[in-house]
């Protein structure tokens, strides 16, 4: 059977992983699915992608979290995105 490969932006996993930490700093922030996705999308657009090659059907162990500098960048991008979404959520308050 042919191997089916695909690309995965590993940065996406990192951003989702840090999202809850950033939200924990801001009790007033909306935590609905729409806002969470908006925050992650905005943050990802500020961050460089980190693509890895994956093979369909293969279970991969989680890559080690990015180095401290990258974490700081992700944290900053998420914090900015959170403020943007808070100012203009795409739904009624
Ligand atoms: Zn919301």
Question: What feature does the model see in each segment?
Answer:
Residues 2-93:
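Charged, amphipathic alpha-helical regulatory modules used
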